[in-house]
């Protein structure tokens, strides 16, 4: 039951992950705030789904979900791709957001990425389609988390696609492609609500550390480094992340 007077934490998992990514946050904040977690299109429970949408479609659908659920005070907490969806949402509906928390994500502005990075982002599907699945499973788990809990959880989420590597490759390839296309739009992607940047010191996914340094430098949005955490820092250091989110929300009117 949604309390319309309370803040709603809207958790958006990263690419190929699902609602379980935020289990430790749901457990901690449940009962304190309204909670919404979204399996993005083509992910987990949101399957089957056609791959004919872009990042702004995802933002629009999220808006429709919030409308339907009568969520009027959303604070988006987006991990990786979820953070990009949050920025697209902020671009389309700047007055709707009460707060934005980026966890191991990066800015959507075109100026932060090179032409070579955009070129690669659009051509990742064949890589994921032809990479040996067992190696992909290992790199996909060890590469995003440092803790046993974080790695085991990511492995469980990846095993949803066990036996259907084509679907996994489609989800990943399409996700990176629509990310590149959103960057190429060269829109302001300005966050006008209270915001917080969080990044693990062991985040080796892409260039997240470099991007977050530049994002903080250019916008002065507070940036918190999570010592010893990987790309899924909310699974590596959940207590620290929960404390930061809790402190952030307490300052939102």
Regions found by a protein language model. Name each.
Residues 235-247:
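Post-His helix in hydrolase/transferase enzymes
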Residues 195-229, 235:
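Conserved loop-alpha-helix segment in the C-terminal half of the alpha/beta-hydrolase fold
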Residues 36-77, 243:
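Active-site loop/oxyanion-hole signature of alpha/beta-hydrolase fold enzymes
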Residues 78-82, 86:
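Gly/Ala-rich beta-loop-alpha elbow adjacent to hydrolase catalytic centers
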Residues 91, 98-130:
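Flexible "cap/lid" loop of the alpha/beta hydrolase fold
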Residues 111-113, 130-190:
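Conserved alpha/beta-hydrolase catalytic His-Asp/Glu region
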Residues 24, 88-92:
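Active-site signature of alpha/beta-hydrolase-fold catalytic machinery across serine-
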Residues 2-48:
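Conserved HGGG/HGGXW glycine-rich cap/lid loop of the alpha/beta-hydrolase fold
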């Amino acid at each position: 039951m949604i309390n319309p007077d309370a803040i709603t934490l809207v958790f958006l998992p990263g690419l190929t992950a699902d609602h379980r990514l935020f289990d430790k946050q749901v457990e901690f904040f449940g009962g304190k705030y309204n909670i919404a977690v979204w399996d993005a299109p083509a992910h987990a429970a949101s399957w089957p789904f056609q791959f004919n949408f872009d990042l702004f479609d995802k933002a629009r659908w999220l808006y429709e979900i919030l409308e339907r659920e009568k969520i009027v005070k959303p604070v988006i907490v987006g991990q990786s791709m979820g953070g990009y969806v949050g920025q697209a949402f902020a671009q389309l509906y700047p007055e709707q957001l009460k707060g934005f928390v980026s966890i191991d994500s990066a800015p959507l502005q075109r100026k932060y990425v090179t032409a070579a990075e955009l070129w690669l982002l659009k051509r990742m599907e064949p890589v994921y389609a032809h990479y040996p699945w067992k190696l992909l499973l290992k790199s996909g788990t060890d590469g995003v988390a440092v803790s046993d809990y974080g790695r085991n959880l990511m492995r469980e989420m990846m095993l949803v696609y066990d036996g259907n590597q084509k679907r996994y490759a489609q989800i990943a390839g399409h996700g990176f492609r629509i990310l590149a296309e959103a960057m190429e739009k060269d829109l302001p992607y300005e966050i006008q609500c209270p915001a917080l940047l969080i990044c693990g010191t062991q985040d080796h996914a892409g260039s997240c550390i470099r991007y977050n340094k530049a994002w903080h430098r250019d916008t002065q949005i507070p940036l918190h480094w999570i010592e010893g955490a990987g790309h899924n820092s909310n699974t590596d250091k959940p207590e620290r992340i929960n404390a930061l989110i809790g402190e952030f929300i307490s300052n939102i009117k």
